[in-house]
A protein has these predicted regions:
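Beta/coil-rich, acidic/histidine-enriched accessory regions frequently appended to metallopeptidases
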Residues: 257-329
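Zn2+-dependent metallopeptidase catalytic core
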Residues: 38-126, 152
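Low-complexity, Pro/Thr/Ser/Gly/Ala-rich linker/spacer regions in secreted
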Residues: 27-44, 311-334, 462-464
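Zinc-dependent metallopeptidase catalytic helix centered on the HExxH motif
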Residues: 128-211
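Short helix/loop segments within enzyme catalytic domains
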Residues: 191-219, 232-253
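Short consensus segments that form the blades of beta-propeller domains
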Residues: 175-176, 217-220, 390-393, 450
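Bacterial Sec-dependent N-terminal signal peptides
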Residues: 2-50
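Aromatic, loop-rich ligand-recognition surfaces of beta-strand-rich domains
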Residues: 340-414, 424-464
């Protein structure tokens, strides 16, 4: 992305100039009138650029209710993949994150032989005539012909910037100063590809991003591998991505500004790293502090201890709840590791908040139980389990979560069957509908995935 528009407050109002060239209906591709995405009112047939160094008179090549595609005069007019793909990506985005203004369309602009890279604009910005825009270019005069690889990666990336800059009807991206340009997009794009059923693109993207290394907030950071993918894969996937923006919209400070046409809410400032971890923990429904420490270390880019910021964020935003109560309880298991609870793979490792240790027991017993007993009652609304570092057939497969206040009468709170873990040391979140307080919680494991042994790296209980 070449330019960011999230922080711009235009001092002038610009409108597209009158067009001297008319396009006949036969020159514009439109959706089938019987399609649910068909429209009766067309967007402008031409659009004069008036932003940054852009000065092209754009030609409308396709439109429906989801997308309006514009080419400059140097783009091959036979290219059609944006018509379907961008409409699908935009529809999926709106279905996931909500609407973006009153116009249902994404306005997609393509350049060939100029303006390498891309930028977004949102419906808040007069700079691009109050439209949700992605504007992409290439130095290659024959660009955009494949509709694969970088063609969809770059355009999807720019849509992701609209999400972070205009979700929930609020302008700006409070997290941009933390994840910079592209870290959020890496997980957004992965989710879009999966959501559209483009599994080969999702796999391609995953393989591209897993080895990616960044120098912020510290050198050697793997944003996708160690943060976004574990959060996504272990804690609710698409719903968690959306919930992050929902929580921002509910609780993060904002004020009202105007663009000269209408007034709208805008986030007041950027979040600090502790707030970032706090809001993502709220979105995940689990305490992500340890995951963040493993991924980023304890210092933000300026050298500040973000764990102090996190403690303050919990005070500043108390409505965001994800209290991990595991450490308040006493663990017991019905069969212990041969070396004892304190052994390298003893039961103490099950609740040590270290996702790289594990509990192992040889000779998996039928009806194995692990229990947490608390001095007072709590409402556990969710829990996590983390797979071991090897041999997936040792993972739990069928289990129940139960609660009790006396240790004799137990109530079933959650039942899971046929469960598998996609990767080693994968953390998965399981939500319950429990609203009752219990002083004892246990997981009863009736089957693993086939091994004579059993292992689990971590079990955490989350109070709502």
């Amino acid at each position: 992305m070449k330019q960011h528009l999230f922080g711009l407050i235009p001092v002038c109002l610009f409108f597209a100039t009158a067009c001297s060239k008319r396009i006949t209906p036969t020159e514009i591709s439109t959706a089938n009138p019987t399609s649910p995405r068909a429209v009766t009112t067309a967007p402008p047939a031409t659009w004069q650029e008036h932003w940054f160094e852009h000065n092209q008179l754009l030609q409308l090549k396709f439109y429906d209710t989801s997308v309006a595609v514009y080419f400059d005069n140097d783009v091959n007019p036979s290219i059609t993949w944006p018509d379907s793909y961008l409409g699908q990506a935009w529809d999926y985005t709106k279905a996931t994150y909500g609407s973006f203004g009153g116009d249902s369309r994404l306005f997609a602009i393509f350049h060939a032989g100029k303006y390498s890279g891309g930028h977004p604009s949102t419906y808040f910005d007069t700079s691009h005539d109050l439209r949700n825009v992605i504007d992409v270019g290439s130095s290659d005069p024959n660009a955009w012909t494949s509709g694969t690889g970088n063609d969809i990666d770059l355009t999807t990336h720019e849509i992701g910037h609209i999400v972070e800059g205009a979700s929930k009807g609020i302008h700006n991206s409070p997290a941009f100063g933390i994840w910079h340009d592209s870290k959020w997009m890496e997980i957004y794009q992965y989710d879009v590809y999966l959501g559209l059923g483009r599994t080969s693109d999702a796999t391609r993207w995953y393989n591209l991003k897993i080895p990616t290394i960044d120098d912020f907030p510290r050198s050697g950071t793997h944003w996708f591998r160690d943060w976004f993918y574990p959060v996504y894969n272990g804690f609710g996937k698409t719903a968690t991505l959306n919930k992050f923006f929902s929580l921002l919209g509910q609780y993060f400070p904002r004020h009202t500004v105007t663009n000269g046409v209408f007034s709208y809410p805008e986030y007041t400032w950027g979040m600090n790293f502790g707030e970032f971890v706090h809001f993502w923990s709220g979105a995940a429904g689990a305490d992500l502090k340890q995951l963040a420490l493993n991924a980023f270390g304890s210092l933000d880019e300026s050298g500040n201890d973000w764990t102090v910021q996190l403690a303050q964020a919990k005070l500043d935003f108390p409505a965001i709840k994800y209290t991990d109560i595991t450490g308040l309880g006493t663990l017991s298991v019905t069969k212990e590791n041969s070396g004892g609870a304190g052994a390298t793979e003893g039961s103490s490792k099950l609740v040590d908040n270290n996702y790289n240790t594990k509990f192992f027991v040889g000779g998996f017993p039928a009806g194995f139980e692990m229990q947490l007993t608390f001095p007072s009652a709590h409402i556990a609304g969710s829990y996590t389990l983390t797979s071991g570092n090897d041999l997936p057939d040792r993972d739990p497969k069928d289990w129940q979560l139960l609660g009790s206040n006396d240790g004799f009468t137990w109530y079933v709170l959650d039942v899971r069957t046929g469960q598998t873990f996609e990767s080693r040391n994968q953390t998965r979140l399981f939500r319950t509908t429990n609203t009752n307080t219990y002083s004892r919680y246990k997981i009863y494991v009736s089957a693993n995935n086939g091994s004579v042994d059993f292992q689990t790296s971590e079990w955490r209980l989350i109070e709502y």
